[in-house]
């Protein structure tokens, strides 16, 4: 089956991948654009994992001010070079992250920042809530672990569902940007301010 330039163009527009990568993915999937997107995403995420150990010391600080000037969020997002920091894709990622922080008010950037004592306290509360349910201990532990995942999703930025597209987690958004831009990207820190809150 021959692959048309229109198919390659459509795939490039949807993924940002190179022409040869798009053509190969389309050839491998017999022209199925959706399957080709999946292949390119998997390839990109594998490449992103390799880049995660590289130093990200450049970047930008993005500010989002909610209409009405009652909520503001500031996010520092780092990358490896100022060239990438100046791209529209990187600027959009930083803006989307700041908007997300303003909307969801997370407490931590990643799981590693959450104090172990806070996680254990939450586990204990969840165990107590389920102790009288009459369920076996191993089932209670599975319920508790599932709820701990939900707890992380409420307080950890990278574990949250993106407000503009709940089918995507923030960490996946960052991984996609790493794959597309070809550099390690790290959400370093954030702050959120709201009028009248402590």
From Swiss-Prot:
Presence of keyword Lipoprotein: no
Gene Ontology terms, MF aspect: translation elongation factor activity
Keywords from the named record: Cytoplasm, Elongation factor, Protein biosynthesis
CC per GO annotation: cytoplasm
Keyword presence, Protein biosynthesis: yes
UniProt region (Involved in Mg(2+) ion dislocation from EF-Tu), positions on chain: 81-84
UniProt cross-references to PROSITE patterns, sorted A to Z: EF_TS_1, EF_TS_2
Protein family according to the UniProt entry: Belongs to the EF-Ts family.
HAMAP family, A to Z: EF_Ts
Protein known as: Elongation factor Ts
Gene name of the record: tsf
């Amino acid at each position: 089956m021959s692959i048309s330039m229109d198919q390659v163009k459509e795939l490039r527009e949807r993924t940002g991948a190179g022409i040869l990568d798009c053509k190969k993915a389309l050839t491998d999937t017999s022209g199925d654009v959706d399957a080709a997107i999946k292949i390119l995403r998997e390839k990109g995420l594998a490449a992103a994992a390799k880049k995660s150990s590289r130093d990200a010391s450049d970047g930008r600080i993005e500010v989002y001010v909610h209409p009405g000037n009652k909520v503001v969020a500031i996010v520092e997002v780092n990358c490896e070079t100022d060239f990438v920091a100046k791209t529209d894709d990187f600027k959009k990622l930083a803006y989307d992250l700041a908007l997300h922080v303003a909307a969801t008010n997370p407490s931590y950037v990643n799981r590693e920042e959450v104090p172990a004592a806070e996680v254990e306290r939450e586990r204990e509360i969840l165990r107590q809530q389920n102790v009288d349910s009459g369920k076996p201990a191993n089932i209670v532990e599975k319920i508790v672990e599932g709820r701990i995942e939900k707890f992380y999703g409420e307080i950890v930025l990278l574990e949250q569902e993106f407000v503009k597209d709940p089918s995507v987690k923030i960490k996946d958004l960052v991984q996609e940007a790493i794959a597309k831009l070809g550099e390690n990207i790290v959400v370093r820190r954030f702050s959120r301010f709201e009028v009248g809150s402590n």
